[in-house]
Amino acid sequence: MLADVLRLGEARTVKQLSAIADHVDSLARGVENLTDAELSSRTDVFRRRVADGDVLDELLPEGFAVAREAAWRVLGLRPYHVQVMGGAALHFGNIAEMMTGEGKTLACVMPAYLNAIGGKGVHIVTVNDYLAGRDAEQMGRVHRFLGLTVGVILSEMKPDERRAAYAADITYGTNNEFGFDYLRDNMAGRLEDRVQRGHCYAIVDEVDSILIDEARTPMIISGPADDATRWYAEFARLAALMTRDVHYEVDTRRRTIGVSEAGVALVEDQLGVDNLYQVVHAPLVGHLNNAVRAKELFHRDREYIVNDDGEVLIVDEFTGRVLVGRRYNEGLHQAIEAKEGVEVKPENQTLATITLQNYFRLYDRLAGMTGTARSEASEFRDIYRLGVITIPPNRPVVRRDEVDVVYKTESAKFDAVVEDVVGRHAAGQPVLIGTTSVEKSEYLSGRLTERRVPHTVLNAKHLEQEAAIVAEGGRRGAVTVATDMAGRGTDIMLGGNVDFLTDKRLRSRGLHPTRSPEEYDAAWAEVRREVAAESRTEAREVVALGGLYVLGTERHESRRIDNQLRGRSGRQGDPGETRFYVSLCDELMRRSATFDLEKLMSRLKMPEREPIEAKVVSRAIRNAQSQVEQANFDMRRSVVKYGQVLDQQRRIVYQARSRLLEGEDMQHQIFHMIGDVVTAYVNECTAGRRTADWDLETLRAALSTLYPVVWQPDPRPHMRGLTRSVLRHEVIADARRALVRRKAAIEARSGLRVMRELERAILLDCLDSKWRAHLYEMDYLAAGIGMRALAGADPVVEYHREGHRMFVRMLEAVKEQSIRSLFDATTRMLAPIMPSAARSPGTPDPRWPF
């Protein structure tokens, strides 16, 4: 039908999607006449057809028609024509760009239903636990009506609950939960401890936020590393003694620092160190750099917050949300903790890691939806092989986007913002104010409080109330201050969100959905009718006032984020207005290298509080955003380039783990390991020498550290024409015979299952321990690889080459350690019945080794 939809031009693709929606419309009458039982039974019919060889593309019109009718019967919502188009775009593995308020969540129901019929599981990825739970409950009602099972992954869930959720036909959850579960599954010691069951099809909500904005930060599971806690406080003290532009320089645009000779001299003097850059002091250089970075580049209530428990929590720069469980790596988080004077938690070592790019590449088919994807279309195509299709709105957009108002200073800008908000609030027009940091949202909140303007604040410190705050943001007179785009996923409806207001009213009457579910459900319909009538009246008043007014207090470094803020106004054809207030002192302008800020300000001979209208300013803003967007893109592209190395290595290791957990007979693999390890020993003792010069006694001594050697070296190998190949085969055969004898004894004594379990446990333990050590080494390689550029080398090429060499070395170490551990373990198990001469050297204790 549309198997090659990605290759079509977008205009033609939209026509094709519209034709599919027309086909779905034509089937509406037929499904409307079905009883509830007949409608839900269509799922079993579709499953039988798939089992008989039908492909899902062929079932799309019928499947969508059934899901659409079910949504109407269960939710009272019938997907519009454009929502059906969006659903079809998702089914074919595209990003559906649908404007805010166009009903992306409902559009997702149809492709999720169709793909769940295949029985391999559908993952629907959201940006937070609240949305995952909400959508699993609301949209899940449609799927359950049609006979499908629905699960949700929430952060506090235990493994058994997660396993059950993944076993469902459709599973909702956040990108972090899906990604970290994948990593934990590949650290599991038993097959039954895993929770996921594969990666067939995923739909990513707010796909730009997840696959673009968060893609610079890899997901990492860490464990304790060597303790260097005392140094963090010491270097926080030293950083406080240092002066910017004297002891170090700061590049705010690139977010880097460089310590000067004066800075190094100060540190050496304070620590009593002769040369800070001697190899023995290398860790101290890292502490110094992190302390200065923490001081100059990471600011409280902007990049992070400190909660009431004294924890330093990272704030997502794009959404304003706290990144729960995330910590800066390589000692930076500890440096910030030391700067803030809170408890410094031990530095962690990477145990498992994956980038978001590489995690989502695991899926056989991937799709996404958002209101802002067009500007990143090339990145989606190049990295994720996803096309972007812009779905036309259901109703024309009538929102007015006003030109920016620019001031010379931040103080003048905020004065103007407050006056604008006060005036609109007095008129009753709802206002949504967007800020770029927690610090600025709280500053503005204080200014509004001084002017007695009632308002709500939505930032990283108040996310528990996120949905409720956003739901009431469109009410008459409402003023909402939001950090970046916290609250995405919940529509701001003029007059208020009826369902949220209904729930609020019921709770105020003492009715609760979990504590008194029967009374709550019984009262829901009547109260909702009351609330809906009130909301319609209020919505008409708000429309007359001009709709929702969105006010941005600063241009974001990405135009896409600005557009997301604008998109909160004017949903579904509603009127609305947006405007940005900007100052020449804003962070974006300071980070831009396109113009001289001081020179520009001196040229503008205007009063501080008078807005500026100059093309050079507008051009500077556009250039600054383009510059930062390009820098961020380069950073994400760099993550992909560097990540390819670990991704290939991770796949090899995880596939090997899976074979071990699935109980594959490792006899053949172990014999190969013996051959490889013994060959390495033989080559080391014979390479580059004549046969007469071979030191076979040294070879035997070396082999004796690996296994109980029976083989006796020939004192005159050259006399009988011994070749390296023959020698290698003799020793390999000796080692294999030694292991076979032990295995036979254990199997006779304890059974085949015990021996298989012993082999599996040893190989798994050796693989995991060497992989963890390898990740630790790769972290250090990545941290220092940039220095290769000073010698004219390409850091990426060097990282690939060094990373490959280190991985080969790791695999060799896994083999050697596995063989040594197998002989040690079997010797210990058989110790009571074996003569001492047959035991491996250094293994006298006959205890179970694991």
UniProtKB/Swiss-Prot annotation:
It catalyses: ATP + H2O + cellular proteinSide 1 = ADP + phosphate + cellular proteinSide 2. It comes from the Bacteria. GO terms for biological process: intracellular protein transmembrane transport; protein import; protein targeting; protein transport by the Sec complex. SUPFAM superfamilies: Helical scaffold and wing domains of SecA (SSF81886), P-loop containing nucleoside triphosphate hydrolases (SSF52540), Pre-protein crosslinking domain of SecA (SSF81767). It is a peripheral membrane protein. Its main location: membrane. Keywords: ATP-binding, Cell membrane, Cytoplasm, Membrane, Nucleotide-binding, Protein transport, Translocase, Translocation, Transport. One of its GO terms (molecular function) is ATP binding. ATP binds at residues 83, 101-105, 491. Gene3D superfamilies: Helical scaffold and wing domains of SecA, P-loop containing nucleotide triphosphate hydrolases, SecA, preprotein cross-linking domain. GO terms for cellular component: cell envelope Sec protein transport complex; cytosol; plasma membrane. It is found in: Cell membrane; Cytoplasm. The keyword ATP-binding applies. InterPro entries: Helicase_ATP-bd, Helicase_C-like, P-loop_NTPase, SecA, SecA_DEAD, SecA_motor_DEAD, SecA_preprotein_X-link_dom, SecA_SF2_C. Belongs to the SecA family. Part of the Sec protein translocase complex. Interacts with the SecYEG preprotein conducting channel. Has a central role in coupling the hydrolysis of ATP to the transfer of proteins into and across the cell membrane, serving as an ATP-driven molecular motor driving the stepwise translocation of polypeptide chains across the membrane. HAMAP family: SecA. Monomer and homodimer. Part of the essential Sec protein translocation apparatus which comprises SecA, SecYEG and auxiliary proteins SecDF. Other proteins may also be involved. This is Protein translocase subunit SecA 2. It comes from Mycolicibacterium vanbaalenii (strain DSM 7251 / JCM 13017 / BCRC 16820 / KCTC 9966 / NRRL B-24157 / PYR-1) (Mycobacterium vanbaalenii). The lineage of its organism: Bacteria, Bacillati, Actinomycetota, Actinomycetes, Mycobacteriales.
